């Protein structure tokens, strides 16, 4: 990979990273659009994957056990996802960069410190760190693409406010496929080598429209339909979202930038990411694929964790007060565990240390709301829970994950409607899964079709 131009500020930041050489090579050449950069990358990556498969296509990557098959395919090495890799000790890496590294090198808004999600999307899609001007260009492009077609506006405005926000969200995204460029191109017989270009266009349109859809749902469901639906082209993606939600608070806008960045991607095996990949492999357009992923995200085992943390915290506060002692906390935690429940927000299927997504939210809280009672309670719990979980001997990871903190921050800034939190998660997750979907089509990945077995057949196989 050739060296790209790098500003003095970026070089200074890069020198703080452990792999300076790799980072410098990742700086995008200023002046090029996202599509230009991606178009140059696609043939290079196609050739690299082609040669890699030619040389190592028969290499075995692991074995599958009966328990893996019955256990949600946990641990089976079966998917290729270019955008992120989850390290058990360091947490998620977006194209090789950890969250702290992303916070250092991705462009922030003027006067802000948190990375702009536009920069993260550029990184996920291209593997390169964009310049600030490129991120600003992307913000403007999304603003230009953001308008909703009238049939979707009408549908949203006629949905019952009692309908769950995620149901409204998935329905609206599905309806947006009326204008899918990929679906039209496929119907017109476009060559498969061009699929990625139309998936890219649909993905850009969809990401641009998501804040408008999500804000409309919020205002209709919780604000009696009041609120702005207008996009300000001078604002970034997150700032426009916050404005349309009806909030006018600079720290909350910074929180939203952080939230939308850190929830964007988490490898390809989680339910929402895998669903988008699976449905997209049938050449369903990005709207249908992402809507399917949203329906997976709506499941309580995937997207409701931060709500469960808040419910648990409220029960704790009701029983032990807002400022319980460590002994009171220990007593309540043991009570939770002995009743057969888990402590929500603690543990992770892959991570074996504190989730860096938790850590960056904690750092945000220490900066912006250090005196908040609920944050202080969360800090006490962070001190008390891990030793107790370790003592039980049943938990591989006793440390907090991203969900242990996010709900508390949203509550602090006035967003108390917990049923809406998964919509925020969905807006963020679009960045990762749609970047992956573009690469699925660029690399020509086929329809997904694993082999399944019945229990009777498995019994016969092991008896041989």
From Swiss-Prot:
Its main location: mitochondrion. InterPro entries: Citrate_synth-like_lrg_a-sub, Citrate_synth-like_sm_a-sub, Citrate_synthase, Citrate_synthase_AS, Citrate_synthase_euk, Citrate_synthase_sf. It catalyses: oxaloacetate + acetyl-CoA + H2O = citrate + CoA + H(+). Transmembrane segments: none annotated. It is found in: Mitochondrion matrix. It is an enzyme of class 2 (transferase). Keywords: Behavior, Mitochondrion, Transferase, Transit peptide, Tricarboxylic acid cycle. GO terms for biological process: carbohydrate metabolic process; citrate metabolic process; tricarboxylic acid cycle. Pathway: Carbohydrate metabolism; tricarboxylic acid cycle; isocitrate from oxaloacetate: step 1/2. The keyword Nucleotide-binding does not apply. Pfam families: Citrate_synt. Belongs to the citrate synthase family. Citrate synthase is found in nearly all cells capable of oxidative metabolism. This is Probable citrate synthase, mitochondrial. It comes from Drosophila melanogaster (Fruit fly). The gene is Cs1.
């Amino acid at each position: 990979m050739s060296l790209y131009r790098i500003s003095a500020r970026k070089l200074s930041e890069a020198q703080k990273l452990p792999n300076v050489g790799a980072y410098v090579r990742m700086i995008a050449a200023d002046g090029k659009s996202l599509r230009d950069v991606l178009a140059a990358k696609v043939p290079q990556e196609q050739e690299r994957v082609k040669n890699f498969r030619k040389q190592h296509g028969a290499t075995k990557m692991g074995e599958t056990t009966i328990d893996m098959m019955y256990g949600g395919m946990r641990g089976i090495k079966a998917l290729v996802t270019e955008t992120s890799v989850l390290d058990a000790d360091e947490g998620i890496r977006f194209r090789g960069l950890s969250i702290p590294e992303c916070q250092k090198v991705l462009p922030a808004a003027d006067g802000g410190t948190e990375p702009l999600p536009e920069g993260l999307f550029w990184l996920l899609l291209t593997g390169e760190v964009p310049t600030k001007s490129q991120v600003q260009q992307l913000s403007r492009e999304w603003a230009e693409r953001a308008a909703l077609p009238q049939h979707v506006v009408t549908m949203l405005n006629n949905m019952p406010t009692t309908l769950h926000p995620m149901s409204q969200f998935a329905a609206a995204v599905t309806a947006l496929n009326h204008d899918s460029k990929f679906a039209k191109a496929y119907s017109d017989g476009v060559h498969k080598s061009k699929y990625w270009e139309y998936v890219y266009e649909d993905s850009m349109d969809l990401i641009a429209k998501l804040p408008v859809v999500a804000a409309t749902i919020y205002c209709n469901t919780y604000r009696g339909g009041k609120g702005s639906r207008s996009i300000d082209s001078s604002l970034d993606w997150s700032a426009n979202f916050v404005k349309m939600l009806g909030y006018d608070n600079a720290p909350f806008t910074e929180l939203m930038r952080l939230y939308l960045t850190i929830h964007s991607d988490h490898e390809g095996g989680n339910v929402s990411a895998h669903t988008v990949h699976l449905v997209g492999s049938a050449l369903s357009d990005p709207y249908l694929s992402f809507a399917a992923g949203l329906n997976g995200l709506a499941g309580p085992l995937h997207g409701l964790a931060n709500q469960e943390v808040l419910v648990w915290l409220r029960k704790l506060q009701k029983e032990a007060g807002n400022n319980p002692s460590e002994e009171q906390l220990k007593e309540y935690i043991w009570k939770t565990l002995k009743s057969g429940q888990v402590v929500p927000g603690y543990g992770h299927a892959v991570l074996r240390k504190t989730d860096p997504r938790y850590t960056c939210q904690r750092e945000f809280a220490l900066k912006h709301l250090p005196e908040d009672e609920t944050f202080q309670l969360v800090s006490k719990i962070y001190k008390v829970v891990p030793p107790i979980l370790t003592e039980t001997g049943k938990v591989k990871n006793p440390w907090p994950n991203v969900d242990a903190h996010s709900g508390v921050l949203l509550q602090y800034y006035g967003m108390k409607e917990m049923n809406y939190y998964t919509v925020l998660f969905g807006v963020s997750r679009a960045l990762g899964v749609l970047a992956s979907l573009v690469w699925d089509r660029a690399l020509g990945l086929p329809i997904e079709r694993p082999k399944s077995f019945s229990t009777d057949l498995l019994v016969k196989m092991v008896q041989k």
